[in-house]
Amino acid sequence: MAVPKKRTSMSKKRIRKNLWKKKTYFSIVQSYSLAKSRSFSGVSEHPKPKGFSRQQTNNRVLG
C-alpha cells in the first residue's frame, strides 16, 4: 500500500541548501586560486630579456 512521505521541514531544507551553497563556494574559491597561480606561474617560464641591467653587473671593476 502506498504511503505518502512526510513533508520536509523548512529548517532541514535551509540546512541542506546552505550545505550545498558552502560546497559550491569553496569549489569556486579553490578554482579561482588555482587559476590565479596558473596565471602567475607563466612569468617564471619566460626569462626576462637580457638588457642594460644585465650588462652592468657583468662589467664591474673590482678594485
From Swiss-Prot:
Region described as Disordered? 38-63
Is Cytoplasm tagged as a keyword? no
Task: Enumerate the Pfam families for this protein.
Answer: Ribosomal_L32p
Q: Which UniProt keywords apply?
A: Chloroplast, Plastid, Ribonucleoprotein, Ribosomal protein
**A GO CC term assigned to this protein in UniProt:** large ribosomal subunit
Give the top-rank taxon of the lineage listed in the UniProt record for this protein.
Eukaryota
Gene Ontology molecular functions: structural constituent of ribosome
Q: Which SUPFAM superfamilies match?
A: Zn-binding ribosomal proteins (SSF57829)
Comp. bias (Polar residues): 53-63
Please state the span of the N-terminal signal peptide per the UniProt entry.
none
Biological process according to GO: translation
Under InterPro entries, the record lists: Ribosomal_bL32, Ribosomal_bL32_plant/cyanobact, Ribosomal_zn-bd
Where is this gene product found?
Plastid, Chloroplast
Which family is this sequence assigned to? Belongs to the bacterial ribosomal protein bL32 family.
What is the name attached to this protein's record? Large ribosomal subunit protein bL32c
